[in-house]
């Protein structure tokens, strides 16, 4: 359901960046007038990977083209809705290590955007760590094409190796990253989002042209995504971070659904330049979940 109109107490002032306001209005949000005696706006740091950056969604943030960051990503929608002062350092292909190390020359570690007086931090992270999840998507897509969509060639070849890598590497790295954020802003509200479903729960033969995953590998890839989200949830619980379950919300809005229903673009014949990533509607829904989970409405 759409975000409710912001109350004046929360909509303290319109974000000064015109792109953020324009993007939010395009997604159906309205900006409330500034109260006569507004208090200081929330100080909001947005961290994370391409799902937070909205890589592939227009318009692109011109300040850092390497990160493929959109000014219509969910952090901008949240900021425009709440009147928060946003520092957006989300970046496509980011891994947990990029919270404390420069991802690209000239791109500071993401945790540098978090300060002791930061009020709000949001992020998605973990999907790119060691290439585990993205490698699984690519591997399963390749195997699906080669098998003509039959069987479970990806599961047969890789078994539990992807899940094992999440347990051994991604999960502890997530805890380290979240602890680093919490240490820098101990009083901030910190929320990490789970990843939305890419595939439906069961194979849909009509979707193979858009998402060439073999019928037996659709539940396999879905199970892997469940495992990744469970790791994110556990890391959140162990670090005092709010976990926002976006997978549950995205049920029925996977990459196999038609335009206007899907929140994730398919591997082929999608409407975004970056496949298997949230579209503008998906980013809007992510913003709604953040607002509701953190009581920002």
What name fits each language-model region?
Residues 39-93, 111-112, 140-147:
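Serine-esterase "nucleophile elbow" of acetyl-processing enzymes
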Residues 43-48, 52-53, 85-90, 119-124, ...:
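Structural recognition of the beta-strand scaffold that forms the well-ordered cores
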Residues 78-85, 172-189, 224-245:
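A structural motif corresponding to the C-terminal end of an alpha-helix
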Residues 94-111, 256-270:
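Charged, often glycine-rich, active-site loop that binds/positions anionic groups
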Residues 196-297:
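Catalytic His-Asp segment of secreted/periplasmic serine-dependent ester chemistry enzymes
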């Amino acid at each position: 359901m759409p975000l409710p109109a912001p109350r004046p107490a929360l909509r303290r002032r319109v974000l000064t960046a015109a792109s953020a306001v324009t993007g939010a209005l395009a997604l159906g949000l309205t900006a409330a007038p500034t109260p006569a005696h507004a208090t200081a706006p929330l100080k909001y740091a947005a961290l994370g990977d391409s799902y937070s950056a909205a890589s592939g969604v227009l318009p692109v943030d011109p300040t850092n083209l390497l990160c493929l960051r959109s000014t219509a990503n969910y952090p901008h929608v949240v900021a425009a809705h709440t009147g928060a002062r946003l520092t957006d350092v989300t970046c496509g292909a980011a891994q947990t290590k990029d919270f404390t190390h420069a991802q690209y020359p000239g791109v500071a570690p993401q945790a540098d955007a978090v300060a002791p007086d930061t009020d709000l931090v949001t992020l998605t992270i973990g999907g790119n760590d060691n290439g585990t999840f993205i490698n699984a998507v690519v591997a399963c897509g390749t195997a699906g094409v080669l098998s003509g969509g039959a069987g479970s060639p990806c599961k047969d070849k890789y078994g539990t190796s992807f899940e094992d890598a999440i347990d051994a590497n991604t999960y502890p790295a997530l805890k380290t990253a979240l602890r680093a954020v919490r240490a820098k802003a101990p009083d901030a509200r910190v929320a990490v989002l789970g990843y939305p479903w890419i595939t439906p729960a069961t194979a849909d033969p009509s979707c193979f042209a858009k998402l060439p995953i073999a019928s037996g590998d659709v539940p396999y890839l879905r199970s892997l995504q469940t495992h990744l989200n469970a790791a994110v949830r556990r890391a959140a619980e162990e670090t005092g971070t709010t976990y926002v379950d976006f997978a549950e919300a995205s049920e029925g809005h996977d990459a196999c659904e038609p335009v206007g229903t899907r929140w994730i673009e398919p591997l082929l014949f999608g409407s975004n330049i970056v496949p298997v990533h949230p579209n503008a509607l998906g980013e809007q829904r992510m913003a709604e979940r953040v607002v509701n989970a953190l009581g920002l409405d």
